[in-house]
Amino acid sequence: GATGAPGIAGAPGFPGARGPSGPQGPSGAPGPKGVQGPPGPQGPRGLTGPIGPPGPAGAPGDKGEAGPSGPPGPTGARGSAGPPGATGFPGAAGRGETGPAGPAGPPGPAGAR
């Protein structure tokens, strides 16, 4: 005789086994910047620097006091003789003693005849 109608479909099968994990996705965008932390402690003191160059010369000092007087100098050479003095006044008149008698005079002239 003729072929019969198809039978009723069977029930669905069981789910298959879980597939393998997919590849890792790309990294996400960077997050926002965090808040700035507090300042750190002060570092240790640095080494002492080298000695600086000498300063400029000072201003000149005040003038000193005058020294004591020196010893007396040697005696100078003798000067030349001065001019002659003025003529003196006339002396007083002399008071001579009376001189001795003079010699006898010559003979007189002859007498008259």
Swiss-Prot record:
Note: These protein fragments were extracted from an 80-million-year-old fossil. The tryptic peptides required multiple purification steps in order to eliminate contaminants and to increase the concentration of peptidic material.
Modified residues (4-hydroxyproline): 6, 12, 15, 30, 39, 54, 60, 72, 84, 90, 107
Residue stretches spanning the membrane: none
Quaternary assembly: Trimers of one alpha 2(I) and two alpha 1(I) chains.
Location within or outside the cell: Secreted, Extracellular space, Extracellular matrix
Disulfide bonds: none
Protein family per UniProt: Belongs to the fibrillar collagen family.
Stated name of the protein: Collagen alpha-1(I) chain
Annotated Low complexity bias: 1-36, 75-90
Coiled coil start-end: none
Organism: Brachylophosaurus canadensis
Key word Secreted present: yes
Keywords tagged on the record: Collagen, Extinct organism protein, Extracellular matrix, Hydroxylation, Repeat, Secreted
Entry function: Type I collagen is a member of group I collagen (fibrillar forming collagen).
Pro residues: bias regions: 103-113
Gene Ontology cellular-component annotations: collagen trimer; extracellular matrix; extracellular space
Positions of post-translational 5-hydroxylysine modification: 33
Region spans: Disordered: 1-113
PTM text: Contains mostly 4-hydroxyproline. Proline residues at the third position of the tripeptide repeating unit (G-X-Y) are hydroxylated in some or all of the chains. Contains 3-hydroxyproline at a few sites. This modification occurs on the first proline residue in the sequence motif Gly-Pro-Hyp, where Hyp is 4-hydroxyproline.
